[in-house]
């Protein structure tokens, strides 16, 4: 299993006002690999990650998953996006009226788990990040760091094949950031997932199999 990014370009605007943001991005990520995207603000990192997740269309280029187009209009590709890609954003976006456990079991049930399976997975993942005591808490009862850790667990609930993360440790202290990255990496390795994460925290680079540096829409360390 691999993710192949082939000559991805993205521009915003039209005609003479068109602004290129990505200028031909190429790289591969194999199963079990954890890749970090790094670069200054405006380098194109978030645009690239958003395209990889299917939330934004590229202007040109291809994204292949197991040598097949990742994003098409057919039903199989839609199911892949729903069930096999896990997103972790800077903000947690938790549902305010659901308790922590329900935030997770809802995702599990949507992915086809039984309630028992969803409960077990939620409890296992929360224990790994030290939040098993917060099962019945509502989002407003959590700290910013706790909310983000719940969001990370939520992205892992449905056993995704691809994890895309945008600064997932930005609201965490150094100790918790390390715990979370170790958890994400262990999941990627043990479940043979593909992991791509944006971070500015160079202390976390050592956990990556490779670091891709972007500058002004191009990869500079290819």
Swiss-Prot record:
Coiled coil: none annotated. The keyword Iron does not apply. Its EC number is 7.6.2.-. Signal peptide: none annotated. Its main location: membrane. GO terms for cellular component: plasma membrane. Residues 3-222 form the ABC transporter domain. It is an enzyme of class 7 (translocase). One of its GO terms (molecular function) is ATP binding. ATP binds at residues 39-46. It is found in: Cell membrane. Keywords: ATP-binding, Cell membrane, Membrane, Nucleotide-binding, Translocase, Transport. It is a peripheral membrane protein. Part of the ABC transporter complex hrt involved in hemin import. Responsible for energy coupling to the transport system. Belongs to the ABC transporter superfamily. HrtA family. The complex is composed of two ATP-binding proteins (HrtA), two transmembrane proteins (HrtB) and a solute-binding protein. This is Putative hemin import ATP-binding protein HrtA. It comes from Staphylococcus saprophyticus subsp. saprophyticus (strain ATCC 15305 / DSM 20229 / NCIMB 8711 / NCTC 7292 / S-41).
């Amino acid at each position: 299993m691999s993710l192949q990014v082939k000559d991805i370009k993205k521009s915003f605007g039209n005609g003479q006002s068109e602004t290129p943001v990505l200028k031909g991005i190429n790289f591969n990520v194999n199963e079990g690999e954890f890749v970090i995207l790094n670069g200054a603000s405006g380098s194109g990192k978030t645009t690239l990650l958003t395209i990889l997740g299917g939330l934004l269309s590229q202007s040109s280029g291809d994204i292949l998953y197991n040598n097949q187009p990742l994003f098409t209009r057919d039903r199989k590709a839609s199911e892949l996006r729903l069930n096999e890609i896990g997103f972790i954003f800077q903000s947690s976006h938790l549902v305010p009226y659901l308790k922590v456990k329900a935030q997770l079991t809802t995702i599990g049930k949507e992915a086809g788990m039984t309630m028992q399976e969803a409960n077990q997975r939620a409890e296992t993942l929360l224990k790994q990040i030290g939040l098993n005591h917060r099962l019945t808490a509502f989002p407003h009862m959590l700290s910013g760091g706790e909310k983000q850790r719940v969001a990370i667990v939520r992205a892992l609930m449905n056993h995704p094949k691809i994890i895309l993360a945008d600064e997932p440790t930005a609201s965490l202290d150094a100790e918790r950031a390390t715990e979370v990255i170790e958890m994400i990496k262990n999941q990627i390795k043990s479940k043979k997932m593909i992991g791509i994460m944006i971070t500015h925290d160079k202390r976390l680079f050592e956990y990556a199999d490779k670091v891709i540096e972007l500058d002004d829409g191009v990869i500079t360390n290819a």
